[in-house]
UniProtKB/Swiss-Prot annotation:
Biological role stated in the UniProt entry: Hypotensive neuropeptide.
Record's GO cellular component terms: extracellular region
Tissue expression notes: Expressed by the skin dorsal glands.
Lineage of the organism: Eukaryota, Metazoa, Chordata, Craniata, Vertebrata
Modification Phenylalanine amide, positions: F10
Family the UniProt entry places it in: Belongs to the gastrin/cholecystokinin family.
Protein's recorded name: Caerulein-1.2/1.2Y4
Top-level taxon of the source organism: Eukaryota
Cellular localisation: Secreted
Length: 10
């Protein structure tokens, strides 16, 4: 699931 920062939430 992609986060708003462009990273991914684990």
């Amino acid at each position: 699931q992609q986060d708003y920062t462009g990273w991914f939430d684990f």
